[in-house]
Amino acid sequence: MAAFKLADRLATLPPYLFAGIDKVKAEVAARGVDIISLGIGDPDMATPGFIIEAMKEAIARPANHQYPSYVGMLAFRQEVANWYDRRFGVSLDPATEVIGLIGSKEGIAHFPFAFINPGDLVLVCTPNYPVYHIATGFAGGEVQFVPLLEENDFLPDLDAIPEDTWKRAKMIFVNYPNNPTAATAPLGFYEKLVDICRRFDVIIAHDTAYTEIYYDEDNRPPSILSVPGAKDVAIEFHSLSKTYNMTGWRVGMAVGNPTLVAGLGKIKENMDSGIFQAVQEASIVALRDGDDFCRELRGIYRQRRDTVITALHKAGIQCRVPQATFYVWARVPQGHTSADFVTRVLQETGVVVTPGNGFGTPGEGFFRISLTVDNARLEEAVSRIAKL
């Protein structure tokens, strides 16, 4: 058999975040231990019935089984624009400022190929979703990480970035509500970021997949596009995955600056064939009729969040009370690294949590809990951790 060599770009990939965890998990499971996984952020609840029924009807239409538009059906893009107007007060032209995605991950991964040339500098706020820097590397860009520190509420210190760096930078990736820290960003932060990026012609790529998982009705996470002038420099990536428990459906959208949207569309035109039209039709129903479901979903996550926070604080584990996302970002006990603590928790309790350093160097000293099992299992998981 021929010995084929992988492309050099794959040699630069960091180890898969969950590879080591999966190995230990298999060893623990082989001992007959009941595993509770609070690792990957994948909702445990079903897609709501009204969306499933819309999908059934859409599947029955023969036209939906043909090739879809690579940018998304105009009706889907129009509904995205309607939702943005209703939710954020942001006006979008569905023809030029909205594009459908096969999940936001696809769009984020493709985006650097549209605007980053070899050697271009891209700022990535970290700890972070790994796709930002991996996609940048694949496109030949140079990554400079910008730390998100607890003392700055897990926001990047924009003033600490030298002017020469801003002059060199082509793009910056930001993500709020944030994975993994669960931090939120106030409108004032976006205003400052937009001002700087307009001054230095830096593209803002904003991942905002968690805006609808929030816990304060009077302080809902904003869109960066709510800032006047943001469309000059920003594109925002969103998804139906977390909002409607649709991770497996693979549907999302990117909105904002028409040139940025068109550039991403040019990549997609040559790299994929768009979202299955039946999924788009069901997604129209989700965006149009899903507000009541989202309210109920937030109530469930709020109860789960409170269960975990109360138990962690009682056990002496430090963590902030998240105002958004379905994650809890907690400090590991003194004397442990993130990896050591997570491994010990798994080996001794059968509970899977994610080491903070897997999301970047500033994540060292933290671990992430996903609120993606029911309340009874969460109570059991945290009680096991508390006994360590």
UniProtKB/Swiss-Prot annotation:
It comes from the Bacteria. Its cofactor is pyridoxal 5'-phosphate. Pyridoxal 5'-phosphate binds at Y70, S104, K105, Y129, N179, Y210, S239, L240, S241, R250. Keywords: Aminotransferase, Pyridoxal phosphate, Transferase. It is an enzyme of class 2 (transferase). Gene3D superfamilies: Aspartate Aminotransferase, domain 1, Type I PLP-dependent aspartate aminotransferase-like (Major domain). PROSITE patterns: AA_TRANSFER_CLASS_1. InterPro entries: Aminotransferase_I/II_large (IPR004839), DAP-NH2Trfase_DapL_Desulfo (IPR019881), DapL/ALD1 (IPR019942), LL-DAP_aminotransferase (IPR050881), NHTrfase_class1_PyrdxlP-BS (IPR004838), PyrdxlP-dep_Trfase (IPR015424), PyrdxlP-dep_Trfase_major (IPR015421), PyrdxlP-dep_Trfase_small (IPR015422). Substrate binds at Y16, G41, K105, Y129, N179, R368. Its EC number is 2.6.1.83. Homodimer. Belongs to the class-I pyridoxal-phosphate-dependent aminotransferase family. LL-diaminopimelate aminotransferase subfamily. NCBIfam families: DapC_direct (TIGR03540), PRK09276.1 (NF006756). This is LL-diaminopimelate aminotransferase. It comes from Nitratidesulfovibrio vulgaris (strain DP4). The gene is dapL.
